[in-house]
Amino acid sequence: ESPACNPYSTEDLANGGNGYLPITLQYRPYTAKKAREVSIAGGDFRENFTNRSYLGKTNTAYNEADLDNILECRRAMGDKPVIVCATVNNPMVMHEFEAEADAIIAEFGVSRAAVLDVVFGDYNPTGRLPIQMPKDMDAVEEQSEDRALDMETYIDSEGHNYDYGYGMNYEGVLPAWKK
């Protein structure tokens, strides 16, 4: 499953902070070094501040063990192929595990039977990414969240760009999607 986290900390609030933490799209701990110093997204009537910045704060995905499972699988499988099937609920930083996988299947809520049809060669995939996969968390912080398709996207070890509309089938990369 794509990384998931809690973007709010009552402990941070109790210690004088504003309670807000960065939303991480990676499994390992992420410290927001490029976040805005001032974020005027405040406005909740229960808050006595208007700056929701999380600059310098750290957050970790609560499913960080998913990455450990991939890395352990790679060690256990040795030279045998490793296929990572990621249930994608939001964009994710792929560089943490892409080099350890021989194939990555990104599924967005389809049945397990449909995924297995692709894995076992019973169905030639035709899907494309409906989102951009960020190069890293810096790319996430630098994008304009209200502007589509402006993120620096991940390019894997074989040169595939995980941009909106990217997809592969058994023959190779699907024809380019026209923006």
Predicted segments with their positions:
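C-terminal non-catalytic regions of proteins with extracellular/luminal or membrane-system context
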Residues: E1-K179
